[in-house]
Amino acid sequence: MAIEVKICGLSTAETLEAALAAGADLVGFVHFPKSPRHVPLEAAPALSRAVAGRAAKVLLLVDPDDATLAAAVAAFQPDIIQLHGKESPERVAAIRARTGRPVMKALPVSGPADLAVVPAYAAVADRLLFDAKPAPDDTLPGGNGRVFDWTLLAGLDPGRPVMLSGGLDAGNVSQALSVVRLDGVDVSSGVETAPGLKSPEKILAFVRAVKAAEAASRPSRLKKVEAP
């Protein structure tokens, strides 16, 4: 199965088109005012329409209340809701039931102890996204360009599709894919020139790096040799 590529934090028509043209499988829109990648509700419909079925639309929210959730879902019309805050398993289940949308729960990781919550979230979320745990001085729950020890995920099988995030870019994504089995990779700061400013060139380079790594990892096909 092909590894899915998600470009997150898109906020302009130009960079959205760059992600779609590059072949991204999922495009992420952040609705969180504290983020430099924040997309306000009034800008959401145009971006959502521009996707036009070429990729899955992911709406990233951080600890949304019911009013924020309803307004954002109405504006973005997402295919998947990504929860990137401290939402409990019970809240994840409630959001999934309330919206009727698949939910991807982001889980922050810095050490083995952080994986103890995986079974509880795997029971209620449709997908799991493992991201680097923010440092104490980080103001955002994700998109900080931090990398964690990918080997922590080796052998992990939560019974749900798994995506990796946290400091990925075109230069290190192949290494990540060689360390742990993944269903997808998620990039934001790794395709930016500054916080919130996506680079079409970096987006293309990242997608190409994933595809190249995927192709290189496929078992070689042995040619049949006829006996003399």
UniProtKB/Swiss-Prot annotation:
GO terms for molecular function: phosphoribosylanthranilate isomerase activity. InterPro entries: Aldolase_TIM (IPR013785), PRAI_dom (IPR001240), RibuloseP-bd_barrel (IPR011060), TrpF_fam (IPR044643). This is N-(5'-phosphoribosyl)anthranilate isomerase. Its EC number is 5.3.1.24. The keyword Protease does not apply. Pathway: Amino-acid biosynthesis; L-tryptophan biosynthesis; L-tryptophan from chorismate: step 3/5. GO terms for biological process: L-tryptophan biosynthetic process. Belongs to the TrpF family. Transmembrane segments: none annotated. Keywords: Amino-acid biosynthesis, Aromatic amino acid biosynthesis, Isomerase, Tryptophan biosynthesis. It is an enzyme of class 5 (isomerase).
